[in-house]
A protein has these predicted regions:
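Flexible, glycine/threonine- and acidic-rich loop/arm segments that mediate assembly and lattice contacts
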Residues: 1-181, 187-189, 195, 201-209, ...
C-alpha cells in the first residue's frame, strides 16, 4: 500500500523494477498459384464473369484468388507457433504464427461452457472476470448459431427492461454513437453490468465445411468477444486497436497482396517459354492480439 520511515533515516536500498513482457509474432508467408494453358485460355464457357466475358478460365482464376484470401484469413485465425519442425521435407526455417484462437487460449479469458447455458449466471461470472482485467465498456460478440441462440434466449428470458439493459445506457461508440449503424451492420446489442455487447453471427463457425460442428465449438471455439477499444501506450500515448492485421512493407514495396503473371506468350505474358499463363499470389502478414487478457474465447462443454 505504501511505506513510512523514521526521521533522519536513509533512502531505501530496495526498489521496484517494471516487469516488461515483450511479445513478438512471426509473419506468415501465404502463397497460391493458378495455371491456364494457351489452348484453355481461348475456350468459351457458359458463365458470364462480367462485362460479357465468357472465357471459363477467368472464373477459375477469380475462385483461386478468393480461396487464397480465405486461406490467409484461416491462417490468421488458426495459426500456431511451431516448436518442433519436421525437417524431412527440407523445411527448417518456418516458425509458424500465433493465430487469434491460439492467442486467446494462451492469454485470454476462456469460458468453461456456452454463455447462457445457465441463464444470466454465466454472463455475470464473465463480467466479474472482465472487471478484474480492466476491460473496456464495449464488445463485439461473434458466435456460432448454437451460442447465438442461447444469448437470444438469455436476453428474452431475463425480460427486457428488467435484468438486462435496465438502467444502463447502451454504448455505441464503436459505431460513431449511432444505433442504426450497428443494426445496419447486422449487430444486435444488449447491456449488462456496465458493459454493452454487440453480437453478430460468425459465419466461419456455421459453415459445415469449415468450423461449423459441435466438436469444433467444444474443443476450439463457439464464439469470441472482441474489445472495441484501442490499447494506449503509457509512454508515447499512441493508440493501437485491440486486434490488428499487419503486413510487411518498406520503401514503397508492399507485401499485403502481391499478384503477378508469368507466361510463354499466353495472354500476352512473355517472361517464360512454357505454353501457359501462371497467376501467382503472395502475402506476408501476421495478426496482433493486444491485451489478450481482455478478449474472450467461448468454448462449449466436451
Amino acid at each position: 500500500i505504501g511505506n513510512m520511515f523514521a526521521q533522519g533515516s536513509d533512502q531505501p536500498d530496495r526498489f521496484l523494477e517494471s516487469n516488461v513482457v515483450k511479445r513478438t509474432n512471426p509473419y506468415a508467408i501465404v502463397k497460391e498459384s493458378f495455371e491456364v494453358s494457351g489452348s484453355q485460355a481461348t475456350n468459351i464457357g457458359y458463365i458470364d464473369v462480367g462485362g460479357g466475358d465468357y472465357r471459363y478460365y477467368i472464373k477459375s482464376e477469380m475462385d483461386t484468388r478468393q480461396r487464397f484470401m480465405d486461406k490467409r484469413e484461416m491462417v490468421m485465425l488458426l495459426g500456431q507457433k511451431v516448436t518442433n519442425i519436421d525437417t524431412t521435407n527440407g523445411i527448417t526455417d518456418i516458425d509458424g504464427t500465433e493465430g487469434y484462437f491460439s492467442a486467446l487460449e494462451d492469454r485470454g479469458m476462456v469460458t468453461s461452457d456456452l454463455l447462457g447455458s445457465n441463464g444470466l449466471t454465466d454472463l455475470d461470472a464473465l463480467i466479474k472476470e472482465m472487471d478484474k482485467n480492466g476491460c473496456p465498456a464495449e464488445y463485439a460478440v461473434y458466435s456460432a448459431t448454437r451460442q447465438d441462440l442461447l444469448l437470444d434466449d438469455m436476453v428474452a428470458g431475463a425480460g427486457a427492461g428488467t435484468n438486462v439493459t435496465a438502467g444502463v445506457a447502451a454504448s455505441f461508440g464503436a459505431f460513431n454513437n449511432d444505433r442504426d449503424m450497428a443494426l445496419n451492420l447486422g449487430f444486435k446489442s444488449f447491456s449488462r453490468g456496465g458493459y454493452t455487447f454487440h453480437k453478430n453471427s460468425f459465419k466461419l463457425l456455421n459453415d459445415p465445411t469449415l468450423l461449423g460442428n459441435d466438436d469444433v465449438h467444444n474443443r476450439l471455439a463457439a464464439g469470441v468477444m472482441i474489445p472495441l477499444a484501442n490499447v494506449v501506450d503509457p509512454r508515447s500515448g499512441e493508440r493501437a486497436p485491440a486486434l490488428e492485421m499487419n503486413f510487411k512493407s518498406a520503401g514503397g514495396y508492399d507485401r499485403e497482396m502481391e499478384h503477378w503473371v508469368t507466361g510463354g506468350g499466353v495472354l500476352g505474358f512473355t517472361n517464360d517459354t512454357q505454353d501457359v499463363a501462371k497467376f501467382h499470389y503472395r502475402s506476408e502478414c501476421c495478426l496482433v492480439t493486444r491485451s489478450a487478457n481482455q478478449h474472450v474465447l467461448i468454448q462449449g462443454t466436451v
